[in-house]
């Protein structure tokens, strides 16, 4: 506030006070009809001056206060609009995240089912392969066992045949034939 406007306000306030005091004195002094008109005019003049002085004195601060109030209300409204827009954006983002989460859950479920089916198929294939390997090994092992048993039976048959042949020879060969065979054998080996 400038010095000039402050001085003017003080001057107006003093003039208003003097006029009010004058009108108060005038209203006490008169008692007749002409005095009533004067009193009414003084009061009217007093009201006009008081109203003018108050208007002059309060116009600036009141205007600034109302302007500041208007600005605060406008700022509050703008801030409320921004907060509402921000809340709506966050709400839309949350709604989108929920929709995305539902889609992700469905995708994960489908992926897990597919992976589970593949895993079951792999396990079945491995089990079949292991069963085939076990069968093949059992067949080879049985073939080896059969071959070993054949060889053993063959050896046993040869041994039994030799024993039988030896017994028959012992029964059929006389001691003279035996001496002759030994002599022949010694001659052949001695040569």
Curated annotation (Swiss-Prot):
Cell compartment(s), UniProt: Cell inner membrane
Membrane topology term: Single-pass membrane protein
UniProt-recorded Gene Ontology molecular function terms: proton-transporting ATP synthase activity, rotational mechanism; proton-transporting ATPase activity, rotational mechanism
Keywords of the record: ATP synthesis, Cell inner membrane, Cell membrane, CF(0), Hydrogen ion transport, Ion transport, Membrane, Transmembrane, Transmembrane helix, Transport
Pfam families documented for this protein: ATP-synt_B
GO CC term (a single one): plasma membrane
Superkingdom in the source lineage: Bacteria
Broad class of where this protein is predominantly found: membrane
Transmembrane segments: 7-25
Described function: F(1)F(0) ATP synthase produces ATP from ADP in the presence of a proton or sodium gradient. F-type ATPases consist of two structural domains, F(1) containing the extramembraneous catalytic core and F(0) containing the membrane proton channel, linked together by a central stalk and a peripheral stalk. During catalysis, ATP synthesis in the catalytic domain of F(1) is coupled via a rotary mechanism of the central stalk subunits to proton translocation. Component of the F(0) channel, it forms part of the peripheral stalk, linking F(1) to F(0).
Subunit structure: F-type ATPases have 2 components, F(1) - the catalytic core - and F(0) - the membrane proton channel. F(1) has five subunits: alpha(3), beta(3), gamma(1), delta(1), epsilon(1). F(0) has three main subunits: a(1), b(2) and c(10-14). The alpha and beta chains form an alternating ring which encloses part of the gamma chain. F(1) is attached to F(0) by a central stalk formed by the gamma and epsilon chains, while a peripheral stalk is formed by the delta and b chains.
Family: Belongs to the ATPase B chain family.
Name recorded for this polypeptide: ATP synthase subunit b 1
Organism: Syntrophotalea carbinolica (strain DSM 2380 / NBRC 103641 / GraBd1) (Pelobacter carbinolicus)
Taxonomic lineage of the native organism: Bacteria, Pseudomonadati, Thermodesulfobacteriota, Desulfuromonadia, Desulfuromonadales
């Amino acid at each position: 506030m400038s010095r000039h406007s402050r001085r003017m306000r003080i001057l107006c306030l003093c003039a208003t006070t003097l006029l009010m005091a004058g009108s108060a004195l005038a209203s006490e002094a008169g008692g007749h009809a002409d005095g009533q008109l004067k009193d009414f005019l003084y009061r009217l003049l007093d009201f006009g001056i008081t109203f003018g002085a108050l208007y002059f004195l309060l116009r600036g601060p009141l205007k600034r206060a109302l302007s500041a109030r208007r600005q605060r209300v406008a700022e509050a409204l703008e801030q409320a609009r921004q907060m509402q827009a921000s809340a709506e954006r966050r709400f839309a983002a949350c709604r989108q995240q929920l929709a995305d989460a539902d889609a992700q859950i469905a995708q994960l479920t489908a992926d897990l089912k597919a992976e589970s089916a593949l895993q079951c198929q792999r396990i079945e294939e491995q089990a079949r392969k292991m069963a085939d390997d076990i069968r093949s090994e059992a067949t080879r092992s049985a073939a080896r066992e059969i071959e070993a048993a054949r060889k053993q039976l063959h050896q046993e048959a040869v041994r039994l045949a030799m024993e039988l042949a030896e017994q028959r020879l012992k029964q059929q060969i006389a001691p003279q034939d035996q001496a002759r065979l030994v002599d022949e054998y010694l001659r052949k080996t001695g040569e």
